């Protein structure tokens, strides 16, 4: 088996990645597959942390456009990420993976409150750490959370799992001739106005030299290939 090129990773999973074909809620089969793939990394000696979005359950920004207070909507979105985190932790437990769920704000009796040093300690003990509730502040996306937590825990890379094979020069769903980039610099992403993640998250990663790899989580084995250095997805650094 190929050896991992990363010792510690931050895996960013969108809420939509957890949906079934009906486009709603959480598909247990998808969660179980992800848990098995994460378990494979842990068995290879990789320290794994996870940030989950909440868009499969709730989108605060969308309701804000309909008149809801944005702060209230974002708080509801943060709670949606906690629900996804609970589901992911349960799937990992059932796969015999020791996992810890942390929230950016206190949720006594449900999960631990985020603590930087405790998170690193658990990662060193080969426990999967799931970060939920975003940054704990409104107006920040879960992509920003992924980059922030990745920098804080000194991850080697942020792995952004999507439904496409990487970063393209245009939308591959609309243009079958869209070009897939294998390698990009931070400057190229900004100059070409490529949609990798929101600008706040991306500039945070750039300013701290955090590499980003974008790949298709829907491809079985893609996560392992990324971690072992196979040319999979798009690398930004």
UniProtKB/Swiss-Prot annotation:
Main localization, broad class: cytoplasm
One CC-aspect GO term: cytosol
Entry-linked SUPFAM superfamilies: Carbamate kinase-like
Region Involved in allosteric activation by GTP, annotated ranges: 20-25
CDD domains per UniProt: AAK_UMPK-PyrH-Ec (cd04254)
GO molecular function, one term: ATP binding
Gene that encodes it: pyrH
Quaternary organization: Homohexamer.
Keywords: Allosteric enzyme, ATP-binding, Cytoplasm, Kinase, Nucleotide-binding, Pyrimidine biosynthesis, Transferase
Keyword hit for Thylakoid: no
UniProt-listed InterPro entries: AceGlu_kinase-like_sf, Asp/Glu/Uridylate_kinase, Uridylate_kinase, Uridylate_kinase_bac
Protein role: Catalyzes the reversible phosphorylation of UMP to UDP.
Organism: Haemophilus influenzae (strain ATCC 51907 / DSM 11121 / KW20 / Rd)
Catalytic activity: UMP + ATP = UDP + ADP
Subcellular location: Cytoplasm
Sites where the protein binds ATP: 12-15, 55, 59, 162, 168, 171
Top-level EC class as recorded in UniProt: transferase
Regulation: Allosterically activated by GTP. Inhibited by UTP.
Protein residues bound to UMP: 54, 74, 135-142
GO biological process terms on file: 'de novo' CTP biosynthetic process; UDP biosynthetic process
UniProt protein name: Uridylate kinase
Family: Belongs to the UMP kinase family.
Pathways involved: Pyrimidine metabolism; CTP biosynthesis via de novo pathway; UDP from UMP (UMPK route): step 1/1
Enzyme Commission code(s) on record: 2.7.4.22
